[in-house]
Amino acid sequence: MSQLDKIAQQGKLSLGLVFPIEAYSGSVAKMENQEKLAKRAEELGFKALWFRDVPFNDPSFGDAGQLYDPWVYMTHIMNHTETIALATGSIILPLRHPVHTAKSLFSLQELSKGRIILGLASGDRPSEYPAFDRDLGQKSDLFRDSFSYLKALHSDFPVHRSSFYGSLNGQIDLLPKHRYATPMLVTGHSGQSLNWIAENSDGWIYYPRDFRFLEQTMQNWRQALAQTDQEWKPYIQSLYIDLLESKAAHPAPIHLGFKGGSDYTLAHLKLLESHGVNHVIINLKYGSRPAEEVLEELGKSILPHFV
């Protein structure tokens, strides 16, 4: 059983957290007590911790993520936790050579004894592409090409020819060898058709939308799986939450999420579950309370209702 099987089950919903696990204004988080919060999240029953790939701080974008390189920081958090899944949300494939991505992935998958889930994306910050001498207009092709290369590297002494990243002639092999299955998820559309995502990935990560839009999105996802002769694959989404102190507090929208009490939060998550969402990545950036308090309340009032 892969980590994806543990966090995403058909007809059920689980919860994860994305770093930074804190509320912060502006682009740059303080990144304080993250190790303690990660360990507490594991103890409370969150199923995954998510790490972002943000090479540069673009002030116009407004969020620099967890600041540290995702592979380095994942290794750090791995050493402060025991079993919780560690997921990238998401590695920007066009900006990294697939060999380097695979080397980091295989190394950490082995060292963590199979705790890694690989979320992949084409990137949503155009300002980063010139710094890597990448053509933004080719990002869809770059993503697809890198994805194929990365899959090829899972084979022994692989043979593969890439249009952008080089070729493999079967004479060299990438170590360490991987003993654990690594789920590969696509974030957003990454410039690909939904049928391509359904056929080639192990699941789809998308963004929070209103329930009418979500219903159509889920219908499109199931249709894409059917059209490509695929069995069920999980649907994962992010969600910004400002959990207010009063459990009965009325909800109000915030960017890509809501603020409200635990009563509304539970009802909202249950509705997501009924629509077929399998895992929700909670982001606390816009919170009004200390993350420690929010984690404890989520652990007491929300987590017992989900897998």
Predicted segments with their positions:
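Hydrophobic faces of well-ordered beta-strands that scaffold small-molecule active sites
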Residues: 15-19, 49-51, 86-88, 116-120, ...
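Conserved, mostly hydrophobic/aromatic
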Residues: 45, 53, 77, 108, ...
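Flexible, glycine-rich active-site loops centered on histidine and acidic residues
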Residues: 10, 14-29, 94-160, 212, ...
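Short, acidic/polar
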Residues: 28-41, 104, 186-196, 260-272
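An alpha-helical appendage that flanks or caps ligand/catalytic pockets
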Residues: 1-11, 132, 137-178, 207-307
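Acidic (Asp/Glu)-rich catalytic clusters
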Residues: 5-9, 42-43, 74-82, 105, ...
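Active-site mouth loops of central-metabolism enzymes
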Residues: 19-31, 91-99, 180-189, 250-263
